[in-house]
Amino acid sequence: MDIKYSAAANHLGSSAVREILKVTQGNDIISLAGGLPGEDLFPLEAVRDAYNRVLSSDTSALQYGLTEGFTPLRDKIAERLTRQGIPVSASEMILTTGSQQAIDLLCKILLDPGDAVLVEAPTYLAALQVLGSYRADIHTINNDEQGILPDHLENQIQKLRPKLLYAVPTFNNPSGATWSKERREKVVEICRRYNVLILEDNPYGEITFEENKDLYPPSLASIDRSYGGDYCVAYTGSFSKIVAPALRTGWIIGDSNLIKTIAKAKQAADLHSSTIDQRALDELLLHFDIEQHIRVISREYYSRMKLLSAELRSQNWEGAHFLEPRGGMFLWLTLSQEINTKELLPLAVENGVAFVPGEVFYSSQPLKNKMRLNFTHTPPELIPVAVQRLEKALVQWRENQSTVRS
């Protein structure tokens, strides 16, 4: 049958990360590609006990639920966010099937084809996919190590009149970078002044490598709410990185009218997210010390990041450099200017290691000598092996280039 796809379907792109994961699945390949937490750190027993308690209590967990999500769980998330400096109530929140759905639903209610959206460079690949599916006109804001540049942001707002600024200001995916407090305050002030909604995506913010949380800047949502009155920041979070991704439970908070409109879009999409998963998470938060669990995984991820950093430095590749992230899951490696990491990837896979080429994280003018390396999923004993395999691939790539030139 010759199916006539919609214009929106024809704008759907495939995730480069998902395609890489397909290639590496089941093979003897060490994958530094996916944004995967460490399976050895999943709280398996606590999750199993939570589901057992839910299923042994009554049958209501198997029934349809509220579109906004299980109220006791929303209350607990609101309490955690309030302790983190984001005062919020359950009425300003909706639970979603991971924070990825939150991004999609917000774009669905906000964007018409051709609407301008501002992003960082680089930025989260799957957010670019969502924006592309709604045929947004995506523009990049210049940035430095402190975050996006306020002057360029204001200039682009005046020029483009965007509907949305999408940002991952804390442990950015893919770069691992974190905006400074001063830069955050300026960005929020500008967006409030020009009435531009910010979508602050924060799936990694609780994975911190310094135990003193006061050393980290406040979220954009926290700064925004300090003004009082109308909010210009919608904020997403998730249990995927701090508990387990298969639970598929995230949230978005924002102005109560915004949340009501998102709820209408969610009703049309899937009625509600999984009741049983939300009930199990509620039980988990009641009976499991999630704060201690986050401290444990953060310490282990810090150790793995330092190991990967040391192994990369030991190679002493000409022109290679990176900054160690202060949290999160990714290290952003820059190689010498002539190396194309997309061309390097097949050689890396042949040698038994995978990464994500940096160019997929740009909406335009991609930098081809970058790669994203995940350090959370790979067991520590395999990290040195992964770097050795990457070194072999680089040697082969250079040999191939020499052959082509000759």
PLM regions with names:
Residues 258-259, 263, 333-372, 380, ...:
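Conserved C-terminal alpha-helix-loop-beta "cap" of PLP-dependent enzymes
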Residues 72, 261-264, 295-307, 385, ...:
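A non-catalytic, amphipathic alpha-helix used as a structural packing/dimerization or gating element
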Residues 229-299:
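Conserved core segment of the aminotransferase class I/II
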Residues 8-98, 105, 286-287, 292, ...:
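N-terminal small-domain helix-loop-helix segment of the aminotransferase-like
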Residues 1, 350, 364-406:
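PLP-dependent enzyme catalytic core of the Aspartate aminotransferase-like
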Residues 282, 298-309, 321-334, 344:
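Conserved glycine-rich beta-strand-loop-beta hairpin in the small C-terminal domain of fold type I
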Residues 60-195, 199, 205-227, 301, ...:
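Conserved core of the PLP fold type I
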